[in-house]
Amino acid sequence: MKLKIKKGATVQVITGSDKGKKGTVIAVDANAMKIQVQGVKVQTHYDKKDGLLKKEGFIDYSNVKLVEAASKEKKTSKKATKSKSA
């Protein structure tokens, strides 16, 4: 299934322990229908070398709503920009 939420979009959590938090989408797993949001579902992991590490966990796609879509920048060719300025 194709997801409407893409990497870089701003979303708000609507259910769960992090309800009401807003963040930017870091990663999307379309097969499992899960997304990773910055600052939401922060998990702590202990590593022998680095000590305690904090990392965002994946949350279900249905638990968030889209606030602002990821912006797409228009690609312009060099020829088009030269002809406009000339």
From Swiss-Prot:
Transmembrane segments: none annotated. The keyword Iron-sulfur does not apply. One of two assembly initiator proteins, it binds directly to the 5'-end of the 23S rRNA, where it nucleates assembly of the 50S subunit. GO terms for molecular function: rRNA binding; structural constituent of ribosome. One of its GO terms (cellular component) is ribonucleoprotein complex. The gene is rplX. Belongs to the universal ribosomal protein uL24 family. Keywords: Ribonucleoprotein, Ribosomal protein, RNA-binding, rRNA-binding. GO terms for biological process: translation. HAMAP family: Ribosomal_uL24_B. The keyword Ribosomal protein applies. Part of the 50S ribosomal subunit. The lineage of its organism: Bacteria, Pseudomonadati, Bdellovibrionota, Bdellovibrionia, Bdellovibrionales. InterPro entries: KOW, Rib_uL2_dom2, Ribosomal_uL24, Ribosomal_uL24_KOW, Translation_prot_SH3-like_sf. It holds the Pfam family KOW. Disulfide bonds: none annotated. This is Large ribosomal subunit protein uL24.
